[in-house]
């Protein structure tokens, strides 16, 4: 199973939305949590390795590097040459925003904001890739490379300015 994938070919975008939300912005509002980020190409290599070398019935976590959201946005700014100011959002305010989102949903208004989503932003979804490295002989690339690939792909497809 992969963690949060970053890389090229994210046409929707799905996980790449985190890049679009922070790219080129002078001010980025940053939740207190974090997550494990993995390069999408590493996930593809991991699936092939699991099929070739994995043990039947075993599960392998395809995980890259653990970053707080603040660390991720600092890295994004560094890789893209932008200067940004991070404003840390306290967990209590995200819980209030989530409750408001739930009320809007009950009123029939569509919203991506919910208590559950806000709670997830406040925790550290951190994992280890030790088992996949040991048993599948995988090597994971740095998150910086995955960010570079994603940004280049978004620019090429007009989703970010060139």
Regions flagged by a language model, labelled:
Residues 1-15:
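Flexible, glycine-rich beta-alpha linker
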Residues 1-4, 36, 61:
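Structural signature of the Rossmann-like NAD(P)-dependent dehydrogenase/reductase core
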Residues 113-128:
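Active-site loop of classical SDR/Rossmann-like NAD(P)-dependent oxidoreductases
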Residues 12-15, 20, 75-77, 102:
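Short, glycine/charged-enriched secondary-structure capping and boundary segments
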Residues 37, 66, 126:
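Short aromatic/basic micro-patch
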Residues 18-38, 46:
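A conserved pocket-lining segment of Rossmann-fold NAD(P)-dependent short-chain dehydrogenase/reductase
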Residues 46-111, 129, 134, 143-162:
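Mid/C-terminal beta-alpha module of Rossmann-like enzyme folds, strongest
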């Amino acid at each position: 199973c992969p963690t949060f994938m970053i890389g090229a070919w994210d046409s929707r975008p799905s996980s790449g939305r985190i890049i679009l939300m922070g790219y080129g912005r002078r001010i980025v509002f940053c939740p207190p949590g974090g997550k494990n980020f993995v390069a999408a190409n590493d996930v593809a290599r991991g699936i092939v390795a699991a099929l070739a070398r994995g043990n039947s019935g075993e599960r392998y976590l395809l995980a890259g590097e653990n970053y707080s959201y603040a660390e991720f946005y600092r890295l994004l700014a560094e890789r893209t040459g932008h200067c940004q100011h991070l404003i840390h959002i306290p967990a209590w305010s995200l819980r209030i925003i989530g409750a408001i989102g739930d009320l809007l949903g009950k009123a029939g208004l569509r919203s991506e904001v919910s208590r559950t989503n806000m709670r997830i932003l406040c925790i550290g979804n951190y994992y280890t890739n030790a088992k996949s490295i040991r048993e599948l002989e995988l090597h994971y690339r740095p998150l910086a490379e995955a960010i570079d690939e994603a940004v280049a792909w978004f620019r090429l497809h007009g989703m970010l300015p060139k």
